[in-house]
């Protein structure tokens, strides 16, 4: 297992200070290990997640090579791959790409038109509200990251304007249970990629507006409006220091309300079918999202006192190191449930809705890994039949000297080798 930094590197070094998991602690389940602490309904901090993963790595004896960024993966003749690191190369029959979906913050083109007086941050750069200059803050994006940061920054005493596009409204609790409990037991989180009508669209769905807090506080748009956050539409562009927002805010909010209602209907139907309806509080529906009668469409950033912008506009994977033609025009690997069919022996894991709706969660790794190992083993069996041996081995010829910057946070990500 090749890791660019430390085990659980992103959780240790690339998260803001107050971040907690969106999923309850009981949902932290890995093959052979699950959360066994005294707060199963709580939410781990980033540091606690790092410890959880590191402990697991030690317990299973994972052969991790830390401080080993992968700088290239290329085909090796007719079979297998060559994986390059600053210090050496590996020849392998199969390769599992586990670098994740959140390597590179997505910053819209509008950033190039921001006035020089406005400081810009991505979630990977933001640590806490003290990092920000005095003045108003524009947060762009209203998925889980955007609404959490908008809440934190507003409560720090700064006026926040939140630019809202497509989003998934969530509520932490429903009928006396965590929403994730309902989605887990009802099978929503275990829906397979080959059971949905449009998997491409399903993989692009933003993360739900939830936060993991001790007080189970809500972070949907109504909760943010209640503490003074100004809600505007999607940021369309910036012209002459003026931010222009889409007029689709009401439509986006009505759609998010509709989808939340559908999810709650699914939960209610499951509770009735499985005899749980009478043992939990009765069904109810939440107030519709409150949208200003005349949402702001233009904001002069300088005159409006905007001192900083936080680009909570999503992340993209980084495959700049992958020299195999399997990446599409949008920078995503073409695959069938994690099996890269155009590159035999190459597999993908840890991506949104890879094989199931929970594929990008810690809890989703177990089932996906089991499925992919079956496919991988069948591939290796075929190679062994033809060649008589399989495996991965170091190749030390013509390898460059180790780089001194191999632990930089912007180095290429880890790759798992089998």
What residue spans do the PLM features occupy?
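Compositionally biased amphipathic helical and low-complexity segments enriched in hydrophobic
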Residues: 22, 408, 415-418
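A short acidic, helix-capping loop that chelates divalent metal ions and anchors anionic groups
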Residues: 36-40
């Amino acid at each position: 297992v090749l890791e660019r930094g430390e085990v659980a590197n992103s959780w240790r070094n690339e998260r803001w200070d107050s971040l907690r998991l969106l999923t309850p602690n009981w949902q932290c389940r890995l093959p052979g290990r699950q959360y066994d602490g005294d707060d199963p309904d709580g939410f781990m901090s980033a540091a606690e997640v790092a410890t959880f993963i590191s402990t697991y790595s030690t317990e299973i004896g994972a052969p991790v090579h830390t401080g080993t960024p992968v700088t290239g993966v290329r085909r090796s003749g007719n079979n297998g791959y060559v994986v390059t690191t600053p210090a050496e190369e590996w020849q392998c029959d199969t390769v599992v790409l586990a670098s994740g979906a959140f390597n590179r913050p997505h910053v819209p083109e509008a950033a190039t038109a921001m006035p020089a007086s406005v400081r810009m941050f991505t979630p990977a750069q933001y640590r806490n509200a003290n990092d920000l200059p005095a003045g108003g803050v524009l947060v762009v994006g209203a998925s889980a990251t955007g609404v959490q940061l908008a809440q934190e920054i507003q409560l720090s005493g700064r006026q926040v304007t939140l630019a809202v596009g497509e989003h998934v409204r969530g509520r932490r609790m429903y009928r006396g249970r965590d929403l994730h409990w309902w989605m887990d037991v009802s099978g929503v989180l275990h829906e397979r990629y080959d059971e949905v009508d449009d998997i491409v669209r399903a993989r692009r769905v933003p993360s739900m507006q939830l936060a993991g807090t001790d007080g189970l506080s809500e972070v949907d748009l109504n909760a943010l409006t209640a503490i003074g956050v100004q809600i505007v539409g999607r940021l369309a562009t910036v012209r002459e220091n003026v931010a222009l927002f889409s007029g689709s805010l009401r439509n986006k909010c009505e759609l998010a309300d509709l989808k939340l209602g559908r999810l709650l209907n699914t939960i209610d139907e499951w509770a009735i079918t499985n005899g749980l309806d009478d043992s939990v509080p009765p069904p109810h529906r939440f107030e519709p999202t409150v949208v200003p009668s005349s949402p702001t469409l233009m904001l002069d950033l300088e005159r409006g006192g905007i001192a900083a912008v936080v680009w909570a506009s999503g992340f993209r994977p980084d495959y700049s190191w992958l020299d195999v033609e399997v990446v599409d025009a949008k920078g995503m690997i073409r695959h069938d449930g994690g099996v890269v069919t155009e590159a035999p022996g190459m597999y993908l894991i840890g991506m949104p809705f890879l094989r199931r709706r929970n594929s990008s969660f810690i809890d989703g790794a177990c089932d996906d890994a089991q499925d992919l190992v079956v496919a991988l083993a069948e591939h290796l069996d075929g190679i062994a039949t033809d060649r008589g041996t399989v495996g991965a081995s170091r190749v030390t010829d013509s390898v460059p000297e180790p780089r001194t910057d191999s632990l930089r946070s912007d180095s290429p990500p880890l790759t798992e080798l089998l």
